């Protein structure tokens, strides 16, 4: 059976390509999703994408993933990384292995960005590779999860 991967993007990631391009680059979320779809299709797997600026919508999507038979999640939680116990609890509750990704290196930024509520339960964390980090996370999910 083909792998089924869910790519989740949190608040403000819909602004990739225009928001602080010196930090996040010029690649748009549509570009990221298109490249991810091609990468997953080449592996004979399925990709579902979802972006929301709302914590509850992301939690609802994570909970739905369990019923859909999602095998792995790649998530860029954006600013919710540093604030959302509820997002962590949702990921823990569904017990779907996930990779946390950040376009920028959160450890080189403001002190409040250094802590992640998700990394302690993630299979892996990728940060600072720009949007290329998505491809690395998806590659890992396809091969290892």
From Swiss-Prot:
Gene3D superfamilies: Dehydroquinase, class II. The record marks 19 as: Transition state stabilizer. GO terms for molecular function: 3-dehydroquinate dehydratase activity. Its EC number is 4.2.1.10. It is an enzyme of class 4 (lyase). PROSITE patterns: DEHYDROQUINASE_II. It catalyses: 3-dehydroquinate = 3-dehydroshikimate + H2O. InterPro entries: DHquinase_II (IPR001874), DHquinase_II_CS (IPR018509), DHquinase_II_sf (IPR036441). Substrate binds at residues 76, 82, 89, 103-104, 113. Coiled coil: none annotated. Catalyzes a trans-dehydration via an enolate intermediate. Homododecamer. This is 3-dehydroquinate dehydratase.
